[in-house]
């Protein structure tokens, strides 16, 4: 490779990183903690403050009296959801919740890719959860109830319930929501997010942390 070509090959990636750092600082934050143990040890009881299983096949869990998480439901799951008093469904999957057609549930579509979630996405979703809780029970879901749902559930724990990063990650990976190897994108975001900045943005009415 000629010297000029080598210089360009080196400079262009550095310039790109500089642009990303200015436009999306949340993407380049360094990790704060390592990966916690993904499962409970043998004989260890499930922590009382972890999400409570309602329907393991659907990966439906109650996180709080008016907040639930699951994989993608279908119309056959409607009686189960109605029995929990769910009023609002927040969908992170790319497809619309067609299974809700004809129901009286409020649906909010927030399509996300776990490897591209930003602080702005999190702030918007957490506000939607809070608003929905004022009306009744809220269900958050994606396709498998793991990566995207796990990320938002962990952020809810940290921002609104004061959990530590380690506590939120431990529940996400060890709570029975699926294989932790499929949650690496969520873990990456949770390891680098500035929780205090997200909380301050929500409290201050801002749409971003920048």
Model segments located where?
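Substrate/cofactor-recognition hotspot
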Residues: 145
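Conserved lysine of the Walker
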Residues: 148
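Short cysteine clusters
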Residues: 142
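Cys-dependent protein tyrosine phosphatase-like superfamily
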Residues: 2-138, 151-210
């Amino acid at each position: 490779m000629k010297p000029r070509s080598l210089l360009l090959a080196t400079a262009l990636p550095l310039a790109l990183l500089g642009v990303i750092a200015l436009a999306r600082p949340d993407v380049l934050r360094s990790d704060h903690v390592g990966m916690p143990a993904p499962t409970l040890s043998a004989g260890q009881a499930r922590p009382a403050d972890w999400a409570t299983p309602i329907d393991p096949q659907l990966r439906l869990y109650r996180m709080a009296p008016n907040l639930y998480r699951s994989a993608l439901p279908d119309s056959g799951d409607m009686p189960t959801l109605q029995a929990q008093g769910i009023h609002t469904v927040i969908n992170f999957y790319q497809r619309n919740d067609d299974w809700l057609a004809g129901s009286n549930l409020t649906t909010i579509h927030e399509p996300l890719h776990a490897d591209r979630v930003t602080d702005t996405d999190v702030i918007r979703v957490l506000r939607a959860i809070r608003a929905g809780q004022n009306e009744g029970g809220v269900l958050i879901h994606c396709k498998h109830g793991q990566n995207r749902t796990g990320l938002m559930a962990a952020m809810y724990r940290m921002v609104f319930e004061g959990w530590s990063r380690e506590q939120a990650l431990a529940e996400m990976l060890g709570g029975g929501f699926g294989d932790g190897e499929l949650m690496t994108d969520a873990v990456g975001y949770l390891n680098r997010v500035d929780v205090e900045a997200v909380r301050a943005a929500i409290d201050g009415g801002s749409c971003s942390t920048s």
